[in-house]
Amino acid sequence: TVNGILDNLDPHSVYIPKADMARVTEEMKGDFVGIGVSFYTYKDTIAVIRAIENGPSAKAGIKGGDRIIMANSDSLFGTHLKDGEIIKKLKGAINSKVKLKVYRRGEPKLLNFTVKRGKIPIKSVDAAYMLTEKLGYIKVNRFAESTYKEFKSGIEKLETLGATEIALDLRDNPGGFLGVAEQIVDEFLEDDKLILFTKNKRGDIEKSYATSKGDFEEGKVYV
């Protein structure tokens, strides 16, 4: 049974029904249509983590830290709403519009925004550039399907520019595919170095080690 399988996994593993799988994985691959925000449910409201750069919400003026209270005439606060229901109210056909009421700290009244839904490109690496002659900077905002490829491209660019040290910025990164995160860590570690270990509910431990030579094993890394 599903519950029996979960008993052998780690305490953070949950079962995702088939009907919800497309929604859960959508933001981890390709483009999708929406308002362009990353959010989490805080207590009984929707808290915006960030508005995706150049996305519909960012263009409309929505910012990280905002709380979305209403979408059109639908209430989006209260403990009764699940993430799936919230997403259904925020998503819609491309070029359709949604009127949002937003609470912003420091503002005396709710703010009104009209957001035109659009195609949101999913980029995992926001930036890769040199801070000094030796120090390169790379910002990874999630661990999605395309992240490793984007990361490799960024690292190669920085090495070409002379980087011998890397500042890896993971702020506001909500996570994603564990295997992709392992691939990235592997680029910094020598062969057979421990990357991570997982411990299931029965206490069984599984370890993952660095494999082949990484692209940045010799330089310093700051996270």
What are these regions (language model features)?
Residues V2-I49, N95-K99, Y103-A127:
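Extended, small/polar residue-biased N-terminal targeting/export presequences
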Residues G65-R67:
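Structural motif
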